[in-house]
């Protein structure tokens, strides 16, 4: 039957509220966590007996293979669980993060959205077993969720890759569209510069594959400590690391966080050296320096090859200060700017002239460094 030509083209679809939201608005959700909480809240308001929900997305990341968001009705909170390479292959079913967590809340109904093996998985836990009609409604939700999840998965994949290779700060800038050459931001922060001692000799005596594994182990200890105390790794340069602890409140908080990160990195490297010794391998001595100042974090480079990098007097100073570790026979050096902001016991080492730095620098160290 032919429809009248003057029939309005925007006739409303007779869809339940949650499905209408999936069609009209869900694709613009700022993140998977907000998407899951919003969808769960709408299903709950629509009468479904939910205790919680879980959403799993595959991500193209060197280490993380899946991200699972877990929503609990009782608190409204959304938490995140990571699946790593070498873990369970299936993102759904018993043994997966989403299913096992939901099973603690109540009866589980789980749906794959799309084709395996990398399809999203959406699951729900009930306060009681889902009836046939309720189960059918959840299956219908799984069908309507495909389009907005495709958009979310694409954004999550891009974010994962950018964060893995650029770091959080640069990834956020690129995603926000601030990728034009010559742009940057001034950041006041506690700076950490660290690198391995005798790296050139070690690399000449070590097979390339073993050298890569050694660097990975070293970077894991340093970057892990930096991230654990709220810092961010800006650069890996050869065997070196440049990290910052941005000043968001009192400068002393950033300095204390940087000092705690150095302590954690030293502890991690001590365990690594013990493991290497048991394998008949040499230890990995390193030097680290801390300074407080302003850096310019900018997008610079050639017209067809850009990079985010940190420049400024503070970067130069912390790099030169780290180079003083070997001459002074110390593994950790701290500038006077950091020493003035911390209550951590430090040992003064006097004023030192740093190459390329106009004014002498007051240098301190840790008692056991």
Language-model region placement:
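Structured interaction and signal-relay segments at domain junctions
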Residues: 43-105
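Signal-transducing coiled-coil linker helices
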Residues: 24-38, 211
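Cytosolic regulatory/linker segments at or just downstream of nucleotide-handling modules
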Residues: 325-369
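Catalytic NTP-binding/metal-coordinating core of nucleotidyl cyclase/transferase enzymes
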Residues: 181-260
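Regulatory loop-to-helix N-cap segments in sensory/regulatory domains
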Residues: 123-139, 310
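Regulatory cytosolic signal-relay segments
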Residues: 135-186
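Helix-to-coil/beta transition segments that act as allosteric "coupling" elements at the rims
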Residues: 97-121, 125-128
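Alpha-helical scaffold within the catalytic cores of cyclic-nucleotide enzymes
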Residues: 216-230, 247-288, 313-324
């Amino acid at each position: 039957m032919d429809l009248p030509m003057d029939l309005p083209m925007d006739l409303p679809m007779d869809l339940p509220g949650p499905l209408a939201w999936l069609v009209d608005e869900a694709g613009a959700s700022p993140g998977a966590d907000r998407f899951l909480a919003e969808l769960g809240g709408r299903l709950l308001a629509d009468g479904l007996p939910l205790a919680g929900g879980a959403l799993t997305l595959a991500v193209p990341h060197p280490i993380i293979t899946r991200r699972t968001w877990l929503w609990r009705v009782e608190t409204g909170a959304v938490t995140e669980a990571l699946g790593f390479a070498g873990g369970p292959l299936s993102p759904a079913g018993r043994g997966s993060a989403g299913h096992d967590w939901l099973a603690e809340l109540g009866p589980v109904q789980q749906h794959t959205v799309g084709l395996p093996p990398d399809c999203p998985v959406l699951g729900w836990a009930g306060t009681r077993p889902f009836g046939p009609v309720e189960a059918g409604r959840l299956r219908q939700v799984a069908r309507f969720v495909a389009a907005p999840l495709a958009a979310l998965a694409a954004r999550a994949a891009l974010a994962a890759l950018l964060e893995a290779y650029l770091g959080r700060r640069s990834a956020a800038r690129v995603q926000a569209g601030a990728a034009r050459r010559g742009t940057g931001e001034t950041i006041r922060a506690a700076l950490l510069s660290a690198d391995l001692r005798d790296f050139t000799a070690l690399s000449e005596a070590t097979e390339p594959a073993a050298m890569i594994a050694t660097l990975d182990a070293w970077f894991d200890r340093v970057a892990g400590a930096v991230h654990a105390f709220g810092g961010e790794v800006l650069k890996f340069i050869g065997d070196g690391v440049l990290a910052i602890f941005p000043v968001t409140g009192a400068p002393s908080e950033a300095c204390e966080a940087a000092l705690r990160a150095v302590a954690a990195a030293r502890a991690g490297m001590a365990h690594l050296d013990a493991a290497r010794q048991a394998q008949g391998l040499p230890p990995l001595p390193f030097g680290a320096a801390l300074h407080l100042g302003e850096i310019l974090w900018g997008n610079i480079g050639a017209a067809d090859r850009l990079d985010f990098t940190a420049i400024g007097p503070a970067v130069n100073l912390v790099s030169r200060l780290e180079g003083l570790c070997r001459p002074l026979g110390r593994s950790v050096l701290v500038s006077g700017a950091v020493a003035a902001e911390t209550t951590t016991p430090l040992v003064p080492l006097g004023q030192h002239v740093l190459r390329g730095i106009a004014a002498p620098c007051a240098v301190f160290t840790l008692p056991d460094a």
